[in-house]
Amino acid sequence: MSSPQLYQRGDVLLADLPFADVVRSKVRPVLVVQNDVANRLRDNLIVVAFSSRVPSLPLPTQYRVKANSPLAQRAGLVRDCVVDCSVIHTIAKSRIRRKIGSFTGEAMDEVDRCLKISLALA
């Protein structure tokens, strides 16, 4: 019997995310933002969504990742995108397809800044 996959904060995963109507879903990349203790103990993960709709000037709640940058390569991302910290999901681990990469500590610091703005914690 295989052991359950352990996910860490900063992992970039492909997940089957539901649309707002919850009837339909789409496989898309997400970034794990939940702490590692909860990641290990819970059946769910807190993630933020990536969007390929990149505005010319990202919002304060968005962190831009350019295709072909070292971060995009490390994260397994092939298109320009933004981490949209205004789109936060709690998803079951069963919705995860696979890990495609991870963010650096520096990039996660920027994501944390965006999350604080999104959640009015700053």
Where are these regions (language model features)?
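Conserved functional hotspots at enzyme active or ligand-binding sites that engage polyanionic ligands
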Residues: 1-122
